[in-house]
């Protein structure tokens, strides 16, 4: 840990550096591990450098001590929650097979009681994908979430657990199902919640319509900047590819900067662009999608090209559907007006349609 934090901070030139803890479940490492992490970060940070901390957790182990630590160190929490109880508990069970919703909600209330900032990370899967508005309204109205990420579950059906094969498990979300899920929530959000609730894929999409680079690697032309470090110092090309063939090396044996800048890692990032099928290159929504995450590019195009994203049909219908309102919000921004004005514009349009 000392070696990684020292090397990571020394390699940064930006005035603000983010240290992110995720797993597995990071809280299993115990609170002392994170206290030590902060101690090292404060020790090695450069003059004038600000350190931001984030943690992705399922929330089941949180208590007052954890929440005091988060508040004292201004840790931004990403809380894994898949919607109302019956949807969350469909797949999020503990090692004994017991449901976890009540424990997660207890953790959420502790975060709120201690004034800890949190985002919601919701997996979209077979158990909740058919109930988009119920999921969204639960987050918005019941728990008061202001920042929401939706992560589509695309899980390969194999024995290795690696990104191999072209079959998916029964709990994976369907492509068209995911597109419909996003469209239903977008219709609610764009009429009522712009500027009040931040949904990551909507914000990223707006950036694409404005012509700005995506903040998400999955919607960028190339990738390779979301490396994964294991507790033993092993560094992998991506947190979706923690597999032997994507091992770059160990930071205890070779400097972090050297591993990040290897030809192997550079090729990994460029492969996203270089292997993009012609079907995608000629697509009208390529500017917003860029082929999606490489981990999901395992089906064929209608013309038989390999490397099409499993979620293509869903992404395509979603990006096509949001084109007009996104173009309107992009125009508002270019004229130094708030994107939230779209709500009044659509309200007026909807009234005219009613007559």
Label every model-predicted segment:
Residues 2, 90-102, 109, 113-218, ...:
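Radical SAM enzyme [4Fe-4S]-AdoMet core and its adjacent flexible, acidic
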Residues 242-355:
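Flexible mid-to-C-terminal extensions adjoining Fe-S/redox cofactors in radical SAM and related proteins
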Residues 231:
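A cytosolic small-molecule/anion-sensing beta-strand core signal
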Residues 32, 65, 103-106, 130, ...:
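Generic recognition of stable, solvent-exposed alpha-helical segments in well-folded globular domains
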Residues 1-20, 29-155:
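Radical SAM/AdoMet-radical enzyme domain recognition
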């Amino acid at each position: 840990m000392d070696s990684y934090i020292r090397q990571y901070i020394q390699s940064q030139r930006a005035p603000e550096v983010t240290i992110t803890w995720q797993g597995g479940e990071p809280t299993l490492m115990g609170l002392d591990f994170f206290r030590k992490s902060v101690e090292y970060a404060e020790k090695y940070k450069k003059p004038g450098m600000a350190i931001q901390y984030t943690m992705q957790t399922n929330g089941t182990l949180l208590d007052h001590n954890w929440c005091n630590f988060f508040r004292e160190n201004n840790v931004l929490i990403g809380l894994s929650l898949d919607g109302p109880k019956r949807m969350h508990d469909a797949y999020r069970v503990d090692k004994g097979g017991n449901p976890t919703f009540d424990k997660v909600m207890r953790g959420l209330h502790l975060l709120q009681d201690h004034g800890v900032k949190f985002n919601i990370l919701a997996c979209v899967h077979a158990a909740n994908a058919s109930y988009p508005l119920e999921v969204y309204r639960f987050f918005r109205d019941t728990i008061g979430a202001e920042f929401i990420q939706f992560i589509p579950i695309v899980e390969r059906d194999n024995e290795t657990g690696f990104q191999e094969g072209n079959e998916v498990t029964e709990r994976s979300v369907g492509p068209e199902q995911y597109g419909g899920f996003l469209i239903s929530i977008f219709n609610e959000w764009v009429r009522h919640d712009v500027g009040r609730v931040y949904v990551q894929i909507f914000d990223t999409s707006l950036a694409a319509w404005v012509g700005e680079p995506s903040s998400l690697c999955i919607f960028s032309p190339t990738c390779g900047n979301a490396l994964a470090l294991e507790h033993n110092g092993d560094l992998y090309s991506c947190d979706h590819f923690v597999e032997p063939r994507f091992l770059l090396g160990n930071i205890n044996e070779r400097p972090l900067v050297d591993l990040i800048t290897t030809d192997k890692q550079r090729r990994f990032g460029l492969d996203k662009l270089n292997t993009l099928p012609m079907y995608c290159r000629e697509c009208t929504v390529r500017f917003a999608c860029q082929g999606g995450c490489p981990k999901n590019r395992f089906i064929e195009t209608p013309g038989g090209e390999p490397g099409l994203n499993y979620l293509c049909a869903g992404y395509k219908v979603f990006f096509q559907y949001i084109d007009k309102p996104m173009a309107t919000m992009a125009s508002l921004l270019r004229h130094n007006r708030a994107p939230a004005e779209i709500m009044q514009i659509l309200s007026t349009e909807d009234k005219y349609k009613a007559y």
